[in-house]
Amino acid sequence: MIPPAFEYLRPNTIPEAIAFLQQYGDDAKILSGGQSLIPMMKFRLARPGYLIDINRISGLSYIKEEAEYLKIGGLTREAELENSLLIHSKYPIIFDTARVIADPQVRNMATLAGNLAHGDPANDHPATMLALGAQVVAVGPQGERVLPIESFFVTLFTTVLQHDEIVREVAFLRRHHEAEGLT
């Protein structure tokens, strides 16, 4: 199937992406990996008039421990999580989740942030992020908001993200020992 017609926008900065979101409102959707959005468009379940491709924005793909947090950038691919030595050694629950998502082709495109922002209850990461007590860091015209994962999901395919916000990163408390688990 071919999706309905849409206008493709490719900002180079977060402020530019936010400006597009403000300009086009609810008729715009963010495209990061597109692994859930594009199929929904093909089935006419989503019909955005504007796709805002944020893949050209630099500085949104990272996995790093900083202070007391592990931070995963908004454009970090599932494959990066699966192949990260840090994730594999200290955060095996994330590794185990990432490695079973679809197939390698999907994991090379799909993002953790997109997985969460899409709000699909069938996705793999929401349960993992709930278990880890994650925080979603969103940025919009009013600045940055830190959203606890426990209150992030509203209902099917709906989150507390405003129409003019982008997920900049997902963060949660660091694990200080290899093989530390959750009980």
Regions found by a protein language model. Give the residues of each.
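C-terminal structural segment of proteins
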Residues: 1-183
